[in-house]
Amino acid sequence: MATIRQRIAGRSLTPGAKLPSVRGLAATLKVSTSTVVDAYERLVAEGAIHSRPGSGFYVASETTPLSLIDVGQRLDRAIDPFWISRQSLDAAHDDLKPGCGWLPSSWLPVDGLRKALRTIARAGEPALADYGSPLGLPLLRQLIARRMADRGIEATPDQVMLTESGTQAIDLICRMLLEPGDTVLVDDPCYFNFQALLRAHRARMVSVPFTPTGPDIELLRKALAEHRPRLYITNSGIHNPTGATLSPVVAHRVLKLADEFGLTIIEDDIFADFEQSPAPRLGAFDGLDRVIHIGSFSKTLSASVRCGFIAARSDWIEGLTDLKIATSFGGGRLAAELVFAVLSDGGYRKHLEALRLRLSAARRDVGAKLKVLGIEPWLEPQAGLFLWCRLPGGLDAADVARAALARNVVLAPGNAFSLAQSASSFLRFNVSQTTDERVFDVLQEALKDAKGQN
């Protein structure tokens, strides 16, 4: 497959050229015909070639720029991940965003950030002007390794690589482990940007229903046996969007299945610092064998400070480091220095303690107000930002979201998180962004509008 791709890129195979027959190429390469068929199908999924029934495989015509909107199922804009992300990011400062995934700036340790910036400004020039090392700032990697150990995950600093964000961490892993057309498992529901990112990698997605204690184990086994996926992306600490946490029993069963089917798991742990006490981590039970653990500081520190990390086996870190150099060279040293300065200060621990209490109160208060409107939380989360809620009377969340957006309130409809499109009556609420009474006034009006459409 690599040879054919290189010949297409080098124009020794031109657009429209017919490829060798399956049997002919198998004989030339001394491989099975099924191996050639699989390779051709991957190239078809990639868009490099196409098949003509009864005629064979041909090099595709000149490629057009990739439009992620056109990759996969076409969705109503109200539940399209890109549309929701743009609405949240482009919203005016005074717009209400109960559907977004981050804390209000007033809930973040801004004073600690200012203090850290002053400290860095007084430091030597390298912190302000130099590239970071390929793995990232050693002091921060040492600190991350110690923090992971508190959650039961054993990793040396050399098994930790800094990234620009949690999203970049997943992107690099996908670049290393996936070929176009590979199958990836996701939870249903799951964080909608997982779907967007996997579209960019032209992966085939299969979803597994998520329960209050983790993925449905029987359906996970069925999906593994039927689809033989390369990866499974999930949250174990605090699940997005449901707020659920993985139970120890389910964690062990997931890892047993991963071992049986040769599955690699990406454990997205960007909400770890919201927890009062650590939930089970797949990376802790697995010892970072089949599990790749990622984290970020955007949620509790600052979305403007782009810094995340990957913790994995040493051989995988080696390959990921090469990819990082190829795609972003040395990485951002200033962000790493800033994160280290804030995390090393006792003020960050106090910030987290206060933040957890504040979120706990917000989950309680927001949940009670939503129930008055007939909007019921799916479960009562132990920690975190989110309430995953069912609308009354089977109302369509997309209709409610459109009505709310007309009143400058951005909501997150359930089917944006559901690959199977099975969450049409759900909304995800960020409790830290749902404290303004105007949200509930608009919700009440939007519910009435949606009822009128039924």
Q: PLM features: residue spans?
A:
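Conserved PLP-binding active-site segment of the aspartate aminotransferase-like
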Residues: 26, 31, 312, 388-394, ...
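Conserved core of the PLP fold type I
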Residues: 122-261, 273-288, 292, 452-453
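Conserved glycine-rich beta-strand-loop-beta hairpin in the small C-terminal domain of fold type I
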Residues: 357-367, 377-390
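Hydrophobic residues in well-ordered beta-strands that form the structural core
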Residues: 186, 207, 265-267, 411-413
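N-terminal basic, amphipathic alpha-helical segments
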Residues: 1-119, 321, 325-331, 353, ...
